[in-house]
């Protein structure tokens, strides 16, 4: 194990940056239960005649990280890549896995160790080279072997990947792996051009080349990303727009104002503070849907050298003593906090599995109580001074700061004093990877299979294990859940994981967003599903 120390960059951040110790300025008061809200996953073109051409502008709430399917970790990268890089599989509005660049769902051998994926014939990459099984193997091998890959753990215990012919990929496993199709319905399944990979190497993300309705044009850092219609796309007659410009607008008020003015035609992540007013305005429509993912708090319990590395030891009470983290959990009134901060639009969460998932169980839906008196008892048992002071790193947008201030106010009665460290979103992604934080608030947009929401975050050495958490029992349960084919068995195993995680508290799950996307009424063909991605590939002006 690494030497006992506090993460070095955290010391630098706290010394050099301005840390906000804000008075309890957000009231945490319970409100009426949230009313039922029906999902609106898309606005269809239907019988209307779409206009061919035009430049659609989408206001993007945060800047994407690298446009590289193998290494990226940002939801906002998925927005852009959805238009540029098609996957072997996708999900539909109901969360069902459907073929995209694969021609059918995978077939699995009786022993569960061999998976065969049929690949479509005919599609071409944006550079003109053909899609075939060999190209898929090149992508999967890169995901499995590239240093810094965030996809390796998503693909499971692969023994080898090969082609059986030009139209079939065969994946052999060391042990059965049930979530493969779900993994290939996200970034792990985005097929990259072998020619571009050979030419660009590690710089592929600067100019990604895939099969998609659009191809990459340019990126102006912190400003915009532009893509254009790809005439080589196999379904080019279904693509209407000439270009899409993703314009970075981190302020929710500015996104809403630009939507009202028509300067942008689509805007993601509208603030719950604005939604009720926007819903009454002429010329603006709203899509809303639930989430497979979560927003939560990550505690750095061992991330001393970056994700994917062996956990170290951090010699602070909140890192080494689970009683202190449990006390923090007991200090938070989720319902009051979420309702007061987000105008009753979001839903409380206590695990990595959404209640509507087929893998949900009573154990995964159970929540810690709000018990500040017990929290103070735990702090006393741990022998830490009260108030116990911690630093919470969070994104510097208005909603995140509002949430952080509400958390700050909520935990006072439990014996905590929270200093808020605002960080720009893309920088915060790097901060969590490096372990340069004490406590951090971020979330995960979610995957249809719970493996994608848990394994890489909670398994020892996982690519997204930002907390540096390591528990052999959790490792075993997650492996067993990935190997099991039966839904009920998997649900039971994930429930057991939830119980342990709620005891150890490397992550505390707080709430699930409703993805709220605005659009102007002169466009249609826009969709968003529970994976959080706004889909524009079939959008059009009317």
Model region roles, listed by residue range:
Residues 231-277, 396, 408, 417:
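Ligand-site clamp/hinge motif
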Residues 47-49, 106, 317, 322-326, ...:
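Extracytoplasmic/peripheral linker and loop segments enriched in polar/acidic and small residues
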Residues 56-110, 141, 209:
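N-terminal lobe/hinge region of extracytoplasmic solute-binding protein
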Residues 346-347, 358, 380-446, 487:
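Ligand/substrate-recognition segments at binding pockets and active sites
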Residues 57, 131-139, 166-172, 212-213, ...:
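Alpha-helical secondary-structure segments
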Residues 118, 152-196:
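Surface-exposed binding/hinge segments that line
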Residues 185-239, 243, 377:
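Gly/Pro-rich hinge or "lid" segments in bacterial periplasmic/extracellular proteins
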Residues 347-381, 399:
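Structural transition elements
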């Amino acid at each position: 194990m690494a030497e006992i120390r506090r993460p070095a960059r955290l010391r630098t951040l706290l010394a050099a940056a301005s840390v906000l110790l804000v008075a309890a300025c957000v009231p945490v008061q319970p409100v009426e239960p949230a009313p039922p809200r029906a999902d609106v996953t898309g606005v269809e073109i239907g019988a209307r005649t779409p206009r061919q051409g035009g430049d659609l502008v989408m206001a993007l709430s945060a800047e994407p990280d690298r446009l590289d399917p193998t290494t990226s970790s940002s939801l906002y990268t998925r927005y852009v890549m959805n238009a540029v890089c098609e996957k072997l599989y996708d999900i539909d509005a109901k969360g069902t896995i459907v073929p995209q660049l694969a021609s059918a769902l995978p077939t699995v051998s009786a022993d569960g160790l061999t998976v065969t994926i049929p690949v479509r014939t005919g599609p071409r990459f944006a550079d003109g080279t053909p899609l075939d099984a060999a190209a898929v193997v090149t992508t999967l091998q890169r995901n499995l072997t590239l240093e810094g890959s965030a996809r390796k753990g998503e693909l499971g215990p692969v023994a080898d990947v090969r082609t059986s012919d030009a139209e079939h990929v065969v994946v052999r496993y060391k042990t059965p792996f049930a979530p493969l199709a779900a993994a290939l319905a996200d970034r792990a399944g985005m097929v990259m051009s072998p020619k571009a990979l050979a030419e660009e190497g590690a710089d592929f993300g600067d100019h990604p080349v895939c099969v998609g309705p659009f191809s990459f044009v340019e990126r102006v850092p912190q400003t915009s990303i532009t893509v254009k219609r790809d005439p080589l796309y196999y379904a080019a007659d279904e693509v209407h727009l000439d270009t899409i410009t993703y314009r970075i607008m981190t302020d929710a008020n500015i996104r809403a104002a630009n939507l009202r003015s028509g300067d942008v035609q689509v805007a993601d992540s509208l603030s719950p503070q604005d939604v009720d007013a926007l819903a009454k305005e002429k010329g603006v429509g709203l899509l809303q849907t639930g989430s497979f993912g979560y927003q939560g708090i990550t505690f750095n319990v061992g991330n001393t050298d970056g994700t994917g590395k062996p956990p170290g030891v951090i010699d602070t009470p909140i890192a080494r003593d689970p009683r202190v983290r449990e006390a923090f959990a007991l200090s938070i009134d989720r319902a009051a906090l979420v309702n007061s901060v987000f105008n009753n639009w979001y839903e409380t969460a206590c695990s990595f599995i959404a209640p509507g998932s087929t893998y949900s169980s009573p154990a995964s839906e159970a929540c810690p109580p709000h018990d500040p008196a017990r929290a103070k008892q735990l702090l006393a048992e741990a022998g830490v001074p009260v108030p116990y002071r911690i630093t919470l790193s969070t994104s510097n947008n208005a909603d995140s700061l509002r949430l952080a201030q509400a958390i700050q106010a909520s935990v006072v009665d439990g014996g905590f004093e929270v200093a808020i460290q605002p960080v720009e979103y893309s920088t915060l992604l790097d901060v969590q990877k490096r372990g340069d934080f004490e406590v951090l608030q971020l979330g995960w947009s979610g995957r249809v299979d719970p493996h994608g929401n848990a394994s890489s975050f909670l398994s020892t050495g996982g690519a997204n294990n930002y907390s540096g958490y390591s528990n052999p029992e959790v490792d075993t349960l997650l492996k067993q859940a990935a190997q099991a084919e039966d839904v009920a068995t998997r649900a039971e195993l994930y429930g057991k994981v939830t119980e342990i995680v709620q005891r150890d508290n490397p992550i505390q799950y707080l709430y699930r967003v409703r993805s709220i996307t605005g659009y102007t009424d002169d466009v249609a063909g826009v969709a968003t599903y529970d994976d959080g991605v706004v889909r524009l590939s079939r959008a059009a002006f009317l």
